[in-house]
């Protein structure tokens, strides 16, 4: 990916979005062709247009500390892949049971619930694979990043927040509980 034009890094910039989409497409191409349905499901989820806030934050943070933006491509794309996998799982009938995401049918509506679960799981491992295979990241940094991600998206983070979301459906909750749930589901991943 070419270095982003310093003066044009905004959420509404078409060049930024096109460059980021190119990186997402390259990430998708890492998936072998063993299951064309899963490949199609992952592609459908990732290319469905979103705001791409998380990758933008990765690039802005890198720029703020003077890093070459190309050196954080895998981190930026991984953040979007993880976010997308969380949305795929969140949309499932056993969770929020949403029919639309980003103006399109949710993945389990376009494909099947089983394919949505598998595609989400595959996106999680794809994000880790992007980081592990990035030659711009040292082995020590990879361990720290993967450890942080495991905590952030695992049972102490995003998954716990989703569990709270399910539990809160049937009871009255306080403002503090809602804030904690949102911090776990969304806020922790933004720290990435």
Predicted feature locations:
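Mg2+-dependent prenyl diphosphate-binding active-site environment of isoprenoid biosynthetic enzymes
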Residues: 15, 19, 28-192
């Amino acid at each position: 990916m070419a270095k982003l034009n310093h003066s044009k890094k905004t959420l509404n910039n078409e060049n930024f979005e096109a460059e980021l989409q190119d990186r997402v497409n390259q990430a998708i191409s890492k998936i072998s062709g063993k299951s064309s349905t899963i490949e199609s499901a992952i592609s459908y989820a990732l290319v469905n247009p979103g705001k791409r806030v998380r990758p933008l934050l990765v690039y802005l943070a890198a720029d703020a500390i003077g890093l070459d933006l190309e050196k954080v491509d895998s981190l930026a794309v991984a953040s979007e892949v993880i976010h997308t996998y969380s949305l795929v799982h969140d949309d499932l009938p056993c969770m929020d049971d949403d029919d639309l995401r980003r103006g399109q049918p949710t993945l389990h509506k376009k494909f099947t619930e089983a394919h949505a679960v598998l595609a989400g799981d595959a996106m999680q491992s794809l994000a880790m694979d992007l980081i592990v295979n990035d030659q711009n990241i040292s082995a020590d940094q990879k361990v720290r990043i993967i450890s942080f991600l495991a905590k952030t998206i695992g049972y102490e983070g995003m998954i716990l927040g989703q569990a709270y979301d399910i539990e809160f459906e049937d009871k009255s909750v306080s403002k503090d509980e809602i804030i904690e749930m949102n911090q776990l589901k969304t806020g922790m991943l933004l720290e990435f």
